[in-house]
């Protein structure tokens, strides 16, 4: 007999878990112990446990560096304080069409408002932090009745992922706990097992093991559009509950999970990050701190040597304490057996500082705190040059974030907003749509995403700088030659548009080609009218002078008239 859906899910969960635990879990546990002790959930029993988990950490430099990375990535890539993405069309000419440009700008603004209302900006720093330390992070963007979309982060060790044939994550399984009350709220009482129903009456806050799978729907029936025949299925079931019983089965048209990976090698499913690069130095740092503390304690409380006659007698090493020695015993002294060489403490501190620098370098602290760490005042040009140099090191990481995290996130938010708006465009549901109806010129075109965050702008600063230098050089040549024809080679309209694009000027501030042409035609007409008025004035003035000229005498005018 063929396995039921529940049995298939249980078997695949076991296979994915075994692959993850045997290959990746030991390293993740070590990274959690030494860098992010509060992150990672390697047993379902770890939920809601508040005891200390940092007992292996003496020097938390790597923890602080990971915090700087998470804050720097969030502020630099997805800061809610400024627009960090904009939409476009594959056809650049279509972008110059007024209605299309206005619609895209309105959609961008509406999407930013939805993202700000949701919990996205609370979740992203956690995602960046876990990705930097463990190399892989995961979160889901699910529909929400109140905020349109809500984001759910999954900590390391609580989920398993798998790749598609395109080496993109298309499967996520996870094991987690819910209280009996939460299960009733989410799935309804009728879907719960008898055990959980009993807990609702006896202890509604008791924790229950739940499993969730989101994966491609291989049992999809083409042509049907109900929630069990969508491209991806989402299935919840109670671990250890009634056989073949599911808590809920639904689906998604788009994969709702974002699983960014810092760096991936070949066919690997999970990634590696800066945490893996500096874990050795971080462990060495803890050992050095322990040895430094031992050395300093030996200096403050050294091992003591005393005459045998003091055995069993009162002796003191406290400040101001007195220990009396036998006068008859020659050479008997009460003194330290080992004196610490202070130079070793300074040398050990230097080694500790070197190991700390390795952690800072691994987590790009020198990039995100570049200005504050400069030892002297620098010019703005030098700071900008250094920033461009540092961005070269972070460039590949940013490109992977765009592909694994930000593109799917924006696509999912846009998809959910379109779903909310379609029925309201058609008048089937009351209320205002989140998005305005698109202009007919867009048709079925796919939109293009362009990132305008601080880090993205810093990467494009090279392009803007080259345009500035080109225009400046052309102006210098024209000034030296005292000939404006040197500027004929420069297409100023195109130069301005490319520069505005490089520095991410809002599209509403840049006029379309048609608007610019209309302004120039109006200006030319005004100049022509002014020139005609000046010419007409000259003709009138000439006629007036001619009418006042004396033609009775012998002068040039009478001679000319006579000759005619």
Task: Give the ranges of each region predicted by the language model.
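Exposed alpha-helical structural elements
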Residues: 4, 64, 68, 99-102, ...
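Charged, amphipathic alpha-helical segments
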Residues: 114-124, 206-218, 478-483
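Long, contiguous amphipathic alpha-helices that act as assembly "spine/axial" helices in icosahedral shell
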Residues: 61, 66, 97-143, 269-304, ...
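Generic hydrophobic, helix-prone segments enriched in Leu/Val/Ile
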Residues: 68-74, 123-131, 210, 257, ...
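C-terminal anchoring/interaction modules
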Residues: 1-39, 43, 301-564
């Amino acid at each position: 007999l063929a396995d039921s859906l529940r049995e298939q899910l249980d078997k695949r969960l076991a296979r994915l878990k075994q692959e993850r635990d045997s290959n990746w879990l030991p390293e993740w546990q070590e990274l959690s112990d030494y860098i992010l002790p509060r992150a990672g959930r390697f047993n379902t029993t770890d939920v809601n446990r508040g005891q200390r988990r940092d007992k292996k950490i003496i020097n938390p430099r790597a923890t602080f560096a990971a915090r700087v990375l998470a804050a720097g990535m969030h502020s630099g890539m997805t800061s809610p304080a400024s627009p960090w993405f904009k939409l476009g069309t594959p056809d650049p000419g279509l972008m110059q069409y007024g209605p299309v440009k206005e619609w895209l700008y309105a959609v961008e603004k509406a999407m930013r408002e939805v993202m700000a209302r949701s919990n996205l900006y609370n979740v992203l720093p956690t995602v960046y932090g876990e990705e930097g330390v463990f190399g892989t992070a995961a979160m889901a963007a699910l529909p929400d009745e109140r905020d349109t979309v809500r984001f759910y982060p999954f900590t390391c060790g609580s989920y398993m992922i798998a790749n598609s044939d395109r080496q993109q994550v298309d499967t996520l399984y996870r094991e987690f706990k819910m209280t009996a009350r939460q299960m009733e709220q989410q799935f309804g009482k009728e879907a719960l097992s008898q055990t959980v129903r009993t807990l609702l009456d006896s202890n509604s806050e008791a924790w229950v093991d739940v499993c969730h799978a989101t994966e491609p729907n291989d049992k999809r029936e083409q042509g049907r559009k109900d929630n069990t025949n969508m491209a991806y299925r989402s299935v919840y079931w109670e671990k250890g509950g009634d056989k073949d019983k599911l808590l809920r089965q639904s689906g998604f048209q788009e994969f709702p999970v974002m699983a960014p990976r810092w760096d991936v090698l070949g066919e690997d499913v999970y990634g590696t990050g800066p945490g893996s690069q500096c874990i050795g130095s971080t462990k060495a740092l803890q050992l050095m701190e322990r040895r430094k503390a031992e050395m300093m304690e030996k200096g403050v409380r050294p091992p003591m040597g005393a005459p045998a006659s003091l055995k069993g007698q009162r002796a003191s090493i406290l400040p101001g304490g007195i220990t009396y020695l036998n006068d008859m015993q020659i050479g008997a002294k009460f003194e330290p057996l080992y004196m610490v060489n202070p130079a070793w403490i300074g040398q050990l501190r230097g080694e500790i500082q070197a190991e700390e620098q390795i952690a800072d370098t691994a987590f790009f602290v020198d990039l995100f705190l570049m200005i504050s760490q400069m030892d002297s005042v620098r010019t703005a040009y030098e700071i900008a040059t250094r920033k461009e140099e540092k961005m070269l090191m972070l460039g590949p990481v940013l490109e992977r974030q765009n592909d694994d995290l930000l593109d799917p996130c924006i696509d999912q938010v846009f998809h959910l907003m379109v779903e909310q708006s379609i029925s309201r465009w058609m008048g089937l549901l009351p209320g205002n749509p989140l998005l305005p109806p698109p202009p007919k010129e867009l048709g079925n075109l796919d939109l293009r995403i362009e990132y305008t965050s601080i880090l993205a702008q810093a990467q494009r600063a090279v392009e803007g700088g080259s345009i500035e230098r080109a225009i400046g050089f052309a102006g210098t040549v024209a000034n030296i030659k005292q000939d404006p024809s040197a500027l004929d080679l420069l297409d100023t309209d195109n130069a301005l548009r490319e520069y505005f694009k490089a520095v991410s000027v809002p599209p509403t501030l840049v006029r379309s080609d048609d608007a610019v042409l209309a302004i120039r035609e109006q200006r030319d007409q005004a100049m022509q009218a002014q020139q005609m008025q000046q010419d007409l004035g000259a003709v009138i003035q000439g006629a007036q002078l001619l009418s006042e000229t004396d033609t009775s005498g012998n002068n040039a005018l009478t001679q000319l008239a006579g000759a005619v």
